Amino acid sequence: PLLKIFQEVGAADKIEWVSLDEAYRLITLDENEKCDYIMPLGKDAFISKLEEYDPGSSAVVSKVFDLIESIEKTLDFVSNIQDFKPSMIKEIFSEHTDFLKVANYSVDEVLKSMGASQKTRDILNGYWCYLGQPTDELNVIHYFTMLHSYIIDGAVIPRGRSHQISTALLEAFTENGGEAWFNTSVKRIIVKNGVATGVELEDGTQINAKAVICNASPYNAFTKLIDEKEIPEKLKKEVNAKTLSAKGFAVFLGLNRSADEL
C-alpha cells in the first residue's frame, strides 16, 4: 500500500530501497538474564532460529504463524469486498473464525493461550515498540498484521533512511506545482460555519484554502489550533475518550571514541 501511494504521487522512482536480511536484534542488559537475539526474515528461518534460542518452541511458533496467515486472509477478504452482500456474513462466520476468535484480545493474551513460553513471547514481541503500546494492551490483529508484513513479506528500508522519503515526496510535490514553506508555524486553523477555510501563521499572515490538512494529533488540533466553540461536541467526546499509549524518544549520540575504546 505504501509503494502504491509513492507511485500515485510520482515519488516511487526517487527512492532506492534496500532489502534487509535480519528482522531485528534484541539486547537486554538485565544482570539476571542478559540476552542477545538476532532474528532473521522469512517464516521458516524465523521459526528455526527461535527454536535455537528456546528449544521446543517451534510447534507453538508454527501455530502462531498459521494464525498470522489466517488473519491476513481475512483482512484480504474484507478489503476486497466491492459490493457487500448478506451472504458474505455467513462466509465470514464459517471461513474466518480464527479472526473472530482473537480480534478482541491483546498480543499477550493470545500468545499465552497458545502456550508460548515467556522467552518465546519476548522474542516474538520484538516489534512492539513500532506500534507504541505494550503487548498486554496491544491488539493482536494490529501486531500480527505487522509481523506478516515484515517476517513473511520481507522488510526493506530506503537507502537514505526516512529522510530520503521526505525529500522524494517534497520533490514530487514541487514538481506538480506545490510550494513548501519551511520554518513556518501555524498559529491556528480558521473555521467558519463548521468548515476549515484556511490557516493563520505565527506572524499573523492568513492563508485561505478550499481544504486544510492537519497532521497534528486530534488533541493538539482541537486544543491548540481550533477555537473551542468551533469544535462539535461529538468530536470533543471522541478525543476525551481516548487514552494515551506508551511514548518513547530516540537519541542519536555521537561519541569521539572508537568501538574498541568504548
Language-model-derived ranges and their functions:
Residues 96-109, 149-171, 181-183:
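Short beta-strand to alpha-helix junction loop
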